[in-house]
Regions:
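Oxidoreductase and adenylate-handling cofactor-binding alpha/beta cores
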Residues: 173-194, 207-219, 261-267
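Beta-strand segments within the central parallel beta-sheet cores of soluble alpha/beta enzyme folds
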Residues: 194-202, 307, 389-393
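Aromatic-enriched alpha-helical interface/lid elements that frame and gate functional surfaces
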Residues: 230, 235-311, 315
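A short glycine-threonine-serine/GTX helix/turn-capping micro-motif
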Residues: 161-171, 194, 226-230, 234-236, ...
Length: 398
């Protein structure tokens, strides 16, 4: 198998939980060597976060795929110096702590850049550098609230709604990943130096829902919660079927709306400008929704989907986890793969998302035990002797 496009890039990941580690995951899937640095003893809280089996966090296993795991106490001077030795032979540093913590550990950007000018440093934090909140602790939940996401999600008469998964962290990790690749391109292709990448958890998610701030800036309007509707598409909703399943429809273009009308046995609406024109159709969104729901409610999911697929309507079933894993299209694409893990045995995890024809991503292994690669990284890579490593262990440095 061909090497990944990031082969030869070494990443030191000294971040915990979600955003930073997810960026490290993406880089590691496509060939980068990722060395995850954790505190001795407890390690990354992600190891026991969320659902567990035999005490092992399931999310940890997937998020920490392909990573070499080492332990290092960055509060101790010897740990800090060993960390800098690791940075000397690396290309990227991913951190996720507050600026004050990085400064205490001598891994703030000013110190890192002075000692390792070649290094790309990606700092993902709750609020980002600069501003009065820069040194406050922050999790994705706070970003989902501050970004405006929670304000626009939910039913009109209901409370702001937070997602039951790591949305802000995930979006921030994507922004961080492509920023790292751009910074490496600048360094290696244009002959530049390393640089700081400053990503917070609020701004990437706010960018996704920028239509809200645009509406306020230009129209003086503050969009609120509208349930499953979208002000640029009708019909657009989730509809319950006769067998108590659900399907979703999006009709962003007039052509799709016409297909929906014909599929639900209302072909006359496909010729009526009031139901085809995007603006006038949106004004009748509730009426159109009711027509679609009435038709869907009289049919099973299979029958409704068959009719919509025959009419080339953009519709899809609402899946739970089991149905997602069983989808024949995703199975044909190899979306999920089974990986043997020494601790938990066979695990089905999602494959790398982007499919590159010449340099595909791959999963070499799932998350390893705490400090599993201490000897290989500190001994073989950095050249520490067995006696030196033993001394560091006794001091609690590694």
């Amino acid at each position: 198998m061909a090497e990944g496009p990031l082969a030869g890039v070494r990443v030191v990941e000294a971040a915990t939980l979600a955003a930073g580690p997810m960026a490290g995951t993406a880089l590691g899937e496509f060939g980068a060597e990722v060395i995850k640095v954790e505190a001795p003893g407890a390690g990354d809280p992600m190891r026991t976060w969320g659902r567990r089996r035999e005490g092992v966090g399931l999310a940890w296993k997937s998020v920490s795929r392909n990573k070499r795991c080492v332990t290092l106490d960055l509060r101790q001077p010897e740990g800090q110096e060993l960390f800098h030795r690791l940075l000397e032979v690396s290309d990227v540093l991913v951190v996720g702590n507050r600026p004050s913590a990085l400064e205490r550990w001598t891994i703030d950007y000013e110190t890192v850049h002075a000692r390792h000018p070649h290094l790309v440093m990606c700092h993902i934090s709750g609020y980002g550098r600069g501003g009065p909140k820069s040194d406050r602790p922050g999790y994705g939940t706070l970003a989902e609230a501050m970004s405006g996401f929670a304000h626009v999600v939910g039913q009109p008469d209901g409370p702001p709604t937070l997602p039951p998964f790591m949305l802000a962290d995930g979006v921030a990790s994507l922004a961080a990943t492509y920023a790292v690749v751009m910074a490496l391109y600048h360094r290696d292709v244009h002959g530049g130096t390393g640089q700081l990448i400053d990503v917070n958890l609020v701004e990437p998610l706010a960018r996704l829902i920028e239509t809200s701030t645009l509406a306020f800036d230009q129209l003086g309007e503050i969009p609120g919660r509208v349930g499953n509707r979208l002000d640029a598409s009708a019909p657009r909703n989730a509809y319950r079927t006769a067998d108590d399943r659900w399907l979703a429809i999006s009709s962003a273009s007039p052509a799709i709306a016409k297909r929906v009308y014909r599929a639900i046995d209302r072909p006359e609406l496909a010729e009526d400008p009031d139901y085809v024109d995007p603006v006038r159709r949106q004004e009748r969104a509730r009426e159109v929704d009711e027509l679609v729901q009435k038709w869907v409610a009289e049919r099973t999911l299979d029958d409704a989907m068959a009719a919509f697929e025959a009419a080339d309507v953009t519709a899809a079933p609402v899946y739970d986890a089991a149905q997602l894993l069983g989808d024949e299209h995703l199975r044909a694409r190899g979306t999920f793969v089974t990986v043997d893990d020494p601790e938990l045995g066979p695990m089905t995890v999602q494959a790398p998302v982007a499919v590159l024809t010449e340099t595909p991503g791959r999963i070499q292994h799932l998350g390893r035990t705490l400090g599993a690669d201490n000897d290989a990284v500190f001994g073989e890579l950095l050249g520490l002797s067995a006696d030196h490593l033993r001394d560091l262990r006794e001091k609690g440095v590694v």
